[in-house]
Design a protein with these regions (language model features):
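Polytopic transmembrane helical bundles with strong interfacial aromatic enrichment
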Residues: 2-253
């Protein structure tokens, strides 16, 4: 049986406490921002200046440094949202509920960016802005799922009830994630097959791959920063009548 070290259990137990979470993330934020800026600068410099032009697409392929990480993040964030929703639904942990709903607008933004940049890339490559193939359609459904979560949460006044409804919707929508991921393998679509996640060897040159991975990591740090900021704001809104919030406000005056 796998035993979790006591220090890890204690850390997550403390993070479930709103005042400890708020104080810890406040100290963490400058470091996250610094790492995000460095990763973004390195990724963009490598992708836009150091990486060679593609032998078929020329320089137009460079949109992948925004498009591909955004598409990856659209899936990643939805999974995080669903897991957080499940934790909040089962164990009724307030922070998990807040993480779930706070993830939705960020995930919707990444999904929109993926669809928009994909259209920009598709016009010169495919000769059309949009086609109703499996990958594009399932990604559009993902955007509607995010918007549905946001709309459902806003429509219910009791936010604990709203969090439960959002969690159920997010869990139902998880079925769309493997459809998006495997759509290019299950159906005949205009999208090419996997080039980075191939088990044997990525088919993208290392000079193009490294900046792409840097941008993907950069986007994850951006998500973490945005998530923590939104979570902190929602936490203050829900806990505004709590003693720790009143004490913090008095100390900061």
């Amino acid at each position: 049986m796998f035993l979790v070290p006591d220090v890890v259990v204690l850390f997550f137990h403390r993070m479930a406490s709103p005042p400890h979470f708020y104080a810890f993330t406040e100290r963490l934020m400058p470091w996250l921002v610094a790492i995000f800026v460095l990763l973004t600068a390195a990724g963009l410099y490598g992708g836009l200046y150091l990486a060679p032009a593609d032998y078929q697409q020329g320089d137009s392929y460079r949109i992948i440094y925004i498009h591909v990480p955004s598409a990856w993040m659209s899936l990643f964030i939805y999974v995080v949202m669903a897991i957080a929703g499940a934790i909040g639904l089962i164990w009724r942990i307030k922070l998990a509920e807040i993480v779930a709903i706070s993830s939705a607008p960020i995930g919707a933004s990444f999904t929109f960016i993926a669809l928009f940049t994909g259209s920009l890339w598709g016009k010169p490559m495919w000769g059309t802005w949009w086609v109703w193939d499996a990958r594009l359609t399932s990604e559009l459904i993902l955007l509607f799922l995010y918007l549905g979560v946001i709309g459902l949460y806003g429509a219910i006044d009791d936010k604990r009830v709203a969090s439960k409804a959002v969690a159920i919707l997010a869990l139902v929508g998880v079925v769309n994630i493997p459809v998006i991921h495997y759509s290019v393998e299950w159906w005949n679509t205009l999208h090419q097959g996997p080039t980075v996640t191939k088990i044997d060897k990525p088919s993208i040159h290392v000079s193009m791959l490294i900046p792409l991975l840097l941008m993907a990591l950069s986007f994850k740090f951006y998500y973490l920063i945005a998530l923590l900021q939104r979570t902190r704001l929602e936490l203050l809104r829900r806990e505004r009548n709590s003693q720790w919030v009143k004490t913090m406000v008095l100390e900061n005056k």
